[in-house]
């Protein structure tokens, strides 16, 4: 916006003139928009007016004399129907012309494509052209220079697989299924062997200990637990020892090679692991000569002592006296390299 530089009165007058000019400019723009809108409406109305005028003109020219209102309406409908029919025919003709133009354009494209294909060197097309010709003498066709150059270039060989390469490290579904099947068969075979071993019977010699030994023998299966063994011993001992009539198997202890064996272990556990105690092996349950009397006690032998079956209450009263002072709970992680008979309370 420009500012007037001069007297104050002249400046105020200039401002008024500029405002009037802006208002006049806005009125011109408003009138211009209104005229454009009127022109749009008139164009739309003129299309309908042209159709209506043509129908009215034809109705006037075809009507002669006085006619009734029904005849006038019927004639008007006929003229409108005929007019619409003509307009539809004109539209169909225009559509047909457009379709012909499109077909001609497509035909021109096809013709150009065929010309381009005819220029390409296609050996199959050459063979077809030779078959169509009559039997003539074969012509010797010399290859072009660029064709001979391409033929002389070495072709890149495709990479092939070497059948001698070891592929055992690669994943193979069939091999994995075979391995899993073999593992399952071996597992079942091993389980059957273990079940057979656990079902084997062994004689177990034991001694009921109440300060002195009372040797007995029972037959058990390798898969039986120490608790089951104590139950069977208790049934046998109740007939001879009155103090055991009200006792349960939980109140008994089984001491083998100076180790107190827990009730949940089985004889199979000691046999398979070849467990060793403080004074002899735990995997043999029959009784032979005392291994402590053999000169070479450092050599592992299967001779063993009879295990002791006793009341837990007796052990609690006498655990400070030999031989109970040597006894200790069984620990599978502890290794006994040498057998000993020395009392742990004596120095």
Curated annotation (Swiss-Prot):
Region (Disordered): 77-142
Composition bias, Acidic residues: 123-138
One GO CC term on file: nucleus
Pfam families: XAP5
Biased composition range(s): Basic and acidic residues: 77-113
Taxonomic superkingdom: Eukaryota
GO biological process annotation, one example: chromatin organization
UniProt-listed PANTHER family: PROTEIN FAM50A, XAP-5 PROTEIN-RELATED
Family to which this protein belongs: Belongs to the FAM50 family.
Name of the protein in question: Protein FAM50 homolog
Organism: Aedes aegypti
């Amino acid at each position: 916006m420009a500012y007037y530089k001069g007297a104050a009165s002249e400046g105020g007058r200039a401002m008024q003139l500029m405002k009037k000019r802006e208002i006049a400019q806005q009125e011109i723009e408003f009138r211009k928009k209104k005229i454009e809108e009127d022109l749009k409406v008139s164009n739309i109305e003129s299309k309908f007016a042209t159709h209506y005028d043509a129908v009215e003109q034809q109705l006037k020219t075809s009507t002669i004399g006085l006619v009734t209102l029904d005849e006038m309406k019927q004639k008007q409908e006929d003229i409108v129907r005929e007019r619409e029919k003509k307009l539809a025919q004109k539209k169909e003709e225009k559509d047909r012309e457009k379709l012909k133009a499109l077909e001609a354009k497509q035909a021109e494209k096809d013709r150009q494509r065929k010309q381009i294909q005819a220029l390409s060197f296609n050996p199959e097309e050459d063979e077809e052209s030779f078959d169509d010709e009559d039997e003539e003498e074969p012509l010797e066709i010399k290859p072009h220079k660029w064709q001979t150059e391409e033929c002389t270039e070495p072709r890149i060989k495709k990479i092939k697989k070497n059948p001698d390469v070891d592929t055992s490290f690669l994943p193979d579904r069939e091999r994995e299924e075979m391995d899993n099947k073999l593992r399952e068969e071996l597992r079942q075979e091993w389980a059957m062997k273990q079940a057979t071993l656990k079902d084997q019977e062994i004689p177990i010699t034991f001694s009921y200990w109440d300060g002195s030994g009372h040797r007995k023998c029972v037959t058990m299966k390798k898969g039986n637990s120490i608790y089951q063994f104590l139950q069977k011993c208790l049934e046998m001992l109740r007939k001879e020892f009155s103090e055991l009539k009200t006792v349960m198997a939980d109140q008994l202890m089984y001491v083998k090679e100076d180790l107190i064996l827990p009730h949940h272990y089985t004889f199979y556990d000691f046999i398979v692991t070849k467990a060793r105690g403080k004074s002899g092996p735990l995997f043999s349950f029959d009784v032979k000569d005392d291994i402590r009397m053999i000169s070479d006690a450092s050599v592992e032998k299967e001779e063993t002592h009879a295990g002791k079956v006793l009341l837990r209450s007796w052990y609690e009263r006498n655990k400070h006296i030999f031989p109970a002072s040597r006894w200790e709970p069984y620990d599978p992680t502890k290794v006994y390299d040498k057998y000993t008979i020395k009392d742990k309370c004596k120095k």
